[in-house]
Regions:
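N-terminal, polar/Ser/Thr-rich
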Residues: 15-69, 182, 530-531, 535
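A surface-exposed beta-strand-loop module
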Residues: 26, 67, 77, 107-184, ...
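Extended, low-hydrophobicity, Ser/Thr/Pro/Gly-biased non-transmembrane segments
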Residues: 112-115, 161-268, 610, 647-656
């Protein structure tokens, strides 16, 4: 007995030691040499990209004044067959200069939220050179696009070296860039002059629009960031060196094969290092930087990142870089929920039980952007759906694979989630509601958004020209998610994953367009998808199919009437349910109605169109089925419950003042 007791104590003590060690915070240190990587990218992937814009940035940041002093050396290489005597630049930070830029006109900046680049010098070929601004649509207040005029053409293979010396004050955060009030936390993105994209003899370099993202070429980055000694820096890429002096530290980051660089600076954050082992045995370092008040979320953040890495490796493709960095931002920061190569920002509510799928969905969504558009770098200004739509679709797949999806919930007092359905609320007090665990069906969140904007704009429309933020959001996020889910259900899940894997392998480190994906899908599945993209990509037709009648026309003969009530077309399945079996037919004709004839000796119960819900854009699934004998008990049950809710609501409202 004594031996058993002693052994039990030993095991408990050992377990406590293991748990304690596991909970210990990590120290953010340089990663050191690794034979599997070169400057942050797997050796195997170095040949997958062509460096076009390479940057060497030396940064000094003063957290007190929020001032960045930067020396930048950019080497741009003409990898095209076309000559150019200009180099265009994005000056995204100038979007915060005043309230008349395309970006700031939406946000109405105050004085603490404004900033702009202040150049001390711009050098080309050891000579000073001037920036020339290009004002889109005559907006002289928007200086987010500029170019330098070269004295001669750069031909294929030629390069140009431009050196910038400038300063930039980090503003109070409004969106994506800035410091958090009340905390020594600054997130710095879109902060340096960055070359546009030269394609087919033209420069693509658009202004910074309020809710759109970016477009730039791949290259190699070397960045040194000097901060006071008590501060820490996390960034795109691998930390290769940390130098300290009496009062300051310099963090050196290298990263090959990316098209942007972002970083944060803070003196109060929890760091946890995790690792993910690929199937080939190589290791990805997961850097988790979490606010002290959200320490309890570290494990959920970690699991979400690892699940995402595993899903991509198993289904689409390897994450090719040495590290991935998650940054949990303060509550007062407006930079959460954004992605950059190798780093992304998240946050979490004070109350976020597991069933809400927050912050899991946010983490998975932002990680997925590492592939779309971190690696498959489409033009987000023109075709935002290629990254936002694909990301929304894949993030939802990951959530349902690893977590089973979330439960329906509503919030009391804005922040406290309650599982169930809320039908009526008065001053944040639920009046008509039900408390029940209901799994949210896949795609439902996107459907709710899509219903708010059925016909304004198409997915094919140029993103920055869509007339409202809602039409942009629906045609970039929710509708493409539903279209991709419909495509998956039409061609099959396995075929969809093969298609995405091929899309990734063919276009990683490139700038594909929508037609590249559409043509690849047609190439794999044949011309049977022509109608699909015509309906869902080029048009904004509303879909609603219904079964409106079942008639017995003879001995063992039945007719089912199916109707297309709106303009949208889909190739549908028609099924007839009997007490013994289920009979199937196809409806592929583009007609408004069709009568389907069935022969069966069994008792007919009902008929249904699209029983597997392949068409996720059908606006009314309730009319998809038709029963021979009406069933009233469900209606009576719902009606009685509804009357009970109304009675409660009237009693509560009647007691108010």
């Amino acid at each position: 007995m004594k031996i058993f007791f002693s052994l039990s104590l030993f095991l408990i003590f050992s377990a406590l030691i293991i748990i304690n060690n596991d909970l210990q915070k990590s120290e953010f240190t340089p990663q050191g040499e690794n034979s599997d990587y070169r400057n942050g990218i797997k050796i195997d992937n170095i040949s997958d990209y062509t460096p076009t814009a390479n940057y060497d940035l030396n940064v000094n940041f003063n957290p007190s004044s929020k001032l960045l002093r930067v020396k930048e050396k950019m080497v741009w290489i003409n990898n095209t067959d076309f000559p150019t005597d200009k180099i265009y630049f994005h000056l995204y930070a100038n979007a915060y200069k005043n309230n008349k830029t395309f970006f700031s006109s939406y946000y109405n900046l105050d004085s603490e939220e404004t900033t702009s680049l202040e150049f001390n010098s711009i050098i080309y070929n050891n000579k000073s050179i001037q920036l020339n601004y290009r004002f889109k649509d005559g907006n002289v207040n928007d200086s987010t696009v500029a170019f330098i005029q070269l004295p001669y053409n750069l031909l294929k293979g030629d390069s140009a070296v431009i050196e910038f010396d400038y300063k930039l004050r980090v503003p109070k955060s409004v969106k994506r860039f800035g410091y958090a009030t009340g905390r020594n936390f600054s997130f710095v993105s879109q902060w340096f002059p960055k070359a546009g994209v030269f394609q087919n003899g033209e420069w693509i370099c658009e202004p910074y629009y309020p809710w759109l993202n970016f477009f730039s070429d791949f290259g190699d980055y070397k960045v040194q960031i000097n901060v006071p000694k008590s501060f820490i820096v996390g960034a795109t890429g691998s930390l290769v060196k940390e130098d300290s002096s009496s009062y300051s530290k310099t963090f050196s980051f290298n990263q090959k094969g990316v098209h942007d660089f972002a970083f944060f600076v803070t003196d109060e954050i929890i760091y946890k290092k995790e690792e993910y082992k690929r199937k080939d045995g190589t290791i990805i370092t997961i850097n988790l930087f979490v606010q002290p008040e959200r320490e309890k979320y570290i494990w959920r953040y970690k699991d979400a990142v690892k699940n995402s890495l595993e899903f991509f490796e198993s289904n689409i493709g390897d994450y090719p870089y040495q590290s991935i960095t998650l940054v949990d931002v303060p509550r007062t920061s407006a930079v959460g929920g954004m992605e950059y190569p190798g780093i992304f920002t998240v946050s979490a509510e004070l109350f976020s039980p597991h069933g809400t799928m927050q912050p899991e969905y946010l983490v998975i969504h932002e990680f997925t952007h590492q592939f779309f558009h971190g690696l498959i770098a489409n033009n987000e200004v023109y075709e935002a759906w290629l990254d936002e739509g694909f990301t929304s679709y894949i993030a939802t797949k990951i959530v349902y694979k690893y977590y089973g999806g979330g439960f329906a919930n509503f919030k009391i007092a804005t922040h406290v989630p309650v599982f169930g359905l809320n039908f009526l609320m008065y001053r944040e007090i639920p009046i008509i509601y039900t408390l029940v665990d209901i799994r949210v069906p896949e795609g439902l969140s996107a459907i709710n958004s899509y219903y708010r904007n059925l016909t304004i704009g198409t997915i094919a429309d140029t993103s920055y020209l869509l007339p409202t933020r809602l039409s942009y959001a629906v045609n970039s996020y929710s509708k493409p998610e539903l279209v991709l889910l419909s495509l998956e259900r039409y061609i099959g899940y396995n075929n969809m994953m093969v298609l995405l894997k091929e899309y990734y392998n063919r276009y990683k480190f490139q700038h594909p367009t929508a037609l590249d994906f559409i043509n690849l899908a047609k190439e794999r599945e044949g011309n049977k998808l022509s109608w699909f993209f015509r309906e869902f990509y080029y048009n904004a037709r509303v879909h609603d199919y219904a079964i409106t009648a079942i008639n017995r026309t003879g001995e063992n003969e039945y007719e089912v009437l199916a109707e297309r009530l709106r303009e949208g077309f889909f190739e549908n399945d028609i099924v007839l349910y009997t007490d013994k079996d289920t009979l199937f037919q196809k409806w592929t004709e583009n007609v408004r109605y069709k009568v389907f004839k069935f022969h069966t000796k069994n008792e007919v119960l009902a008929a249904e169109i699209d029983p597997y819900r392949k068409n996720m854009l059908d606006i009314n699934f309730a009319n998809n089925s038709f029963t021979v004998n009406s069933k009233y008990w469900a209606s009576i049950s719902i009606s009685l419950r509804w009357f009970f809710w109304i009675q409660n609501a009237l009693m509560i409202l009647g007691s108010i003042g």
